[in-house]
Every structure is written in structure tokens, then in C-alpha cells.
């Protein structure tokens, strides 16, 4: 298992329920894929450095997890098909 971090930005038009539902959805993908979540860090609503998809702000969330090498591909697929995701990145922690 490798250690990974993902940061994703959700659309600012979401209410608190919608935001929490999306975070739980992504956590579920990690856990159902055999991953172990180490930390969920909610940064909250922040201004973007530049406009993305016609929005200037979004809800930032960082998740640190351990998983097999195939899980990040599935998580990336779920991020891509979720309309409320403005931007995301998954990186392997080399520490």
C-alpha cells in the first residue's frame, strides 16, 4: 500500500448538506476500494487564484489515505464524472 493525498475543490453553490454528501461519497470510494483514510482536512470556502469553470471560489478539502496503486485511478474517475468537482489532484506521498 502506498500513501496518497488528494485535494479537491467543490463548487461554491453547494449547501452544507451537499458539500458533506460529496465528501462522504469520495471517502466511500476510498474505503470501498480497500483504502484506509488517515486524515480529512476541511479547509472551507476559499477564493481561487484564477477563475475555473466560471467560478472564483470553492470548498477545499484534503484527504490523506493509504491504498493499493489501482485505487487512485478509480478515485480520479469518480472525480471526473462528478459535476460539482471544480478541480482535483491525487499525488503519491514519497516520504
Curated annotation (Swiss-Prot):
Pfam family for this entry, one: Ribosomal_S6
Protein name stated in the entry? Small ribosomal subunit protein bS6
Transmembrane intervals? none
Spell out the disulfide connections. Answer: none
Source domain of life: Bacteria
Write out the similarity annotation.
Belongs to the bacterial ribosomal protein bS6 family.
- GO MF annotations in UniProt: small ribosomal subunit rRNA binding; structural constituent of ribosome
- What SUPFAM superfamilies does the record tag this protein with? Ribosomal protein S6
Give the function comment from the record.
Binds together with bS18 to 16S ribosomal RNA.
Q: What's a single GO BP term from this record? A: translation
What are the alphabetically sorted keywords of the record?
Ribonucleoprotein, Ribosomal protein, RNA-binding, rRNA-binding
Against Gene3D superfamilies, the record matches this protein to:
3.30.70.60
Q: Which GO terms describe its cellular component?
A: cytoplasm; ribonucleoprotein complex; ribosome
- InterPro entries attached here? Ribosomal_bS6, Ribosomal_bS6_sf, Ribosomal_S6_plastid/chlpt, Transl_elong_EF1B/ribsomal_bS6
